[in-house]
Amino acid sequence: MGNKLFVLDLGEIRVDENFIIANSTFVTPQKPTVSSRLIDIPVSAYLIQCTNATILYDTGCHPECMGTNGRWPAQSQLNAPYIGASECNLPERLRQLDLSPDDISTVVLSHLHNDHAGCVEFFGKSRLIAHEDEFATAVRYFATGDHSSPYIVKDIEAWLATPRNWDLVGRDERERELAPGVNLLNFGTGHASGMLGLAVRLEKQPGFLLVSDACYTATNYGPPARRAGVLHDTIGYDRTVSHIRQYAESRSLTVLFGHDREQFASLIKSTDGFYE
């Protein structure tokens, strides 16, 4: 049996377009006043069913991220609110596939921001793969009580409340096979302190390269490549986008971007089918 890839729709986040494409709008002497544009970007996760493993790439936002008692700080809720019906949260999307978090053997976390690692706490029996530098960054925000970033202190507190099977990828480990046709890629620093991708080969088509926020959209990808508005390391980001292009083109893989509205709308969602 070959690999199957399910695309999980986990709702949307409403953001200033400049967060996604840097300098999307800017003032000039000729146009001293320019209005920014709000856009709704998809939040997603990907489930890969293999012969001997069930792998999840990212976990979306926590179901209780919003509201007066929500996980996210008030400023985060104002700046980039989450929008999603109850059926869009990750545990519910898994239930729709007759799965529970306990059925997931491995969770690959592209990075540990609020819209990608919000549901980590539900996976007490899974191996959790994260970049060692990204893990250290998240724990530092938790330890210092710093609520100013996309690393959510209340989420991290829940992760660390009980022992978990963390598998941290070192800086020098570039690639690792997780299952036949499924390879973990270490993109290193860029959008965040440590980004991980996933290459998934399929039987009926070449497959996909899942890159998450290492490259938000096709516009960021180019060519010419354009930087995102939220970056930890600009040089690392540029290097990563070039590496993604070389890796995908040399293997005929389709790049699935982190928050591309048009691309995501075109994909078959888990409620309607899968890729194989």
UniProtKB/Swiss-Prot annotation:
User: Which residues are noted in the entry as Zn(2+) 1-binding?
Assistant: H111, H113, H191, D213
**UniProt protein name:** N-acyl homoserine lactonase AiiB
Binding residues annotated for Zn(2+) 2, in chain numbering? H116, D213, H259
Which superkingdom is the protein from? Answer: Bacteria
The record, for InterPro entries, names: MBL_superfamily_lactonases, Metallo-B-lactamas, RibonucZ/Hydroxyglut_hydro
- Enzyme Commission no: 3.1.1.81
Q: Name one Pfam family in it.
A: Lactamase_B
Among SMART domains, the record links this protein to: Lactamase_B (SM00849)
Q: Which organism is it from?
A: Rhizobium rhizogenes (strain K84 / ATCC BAA-868) (Agrobacterium radiobacter)
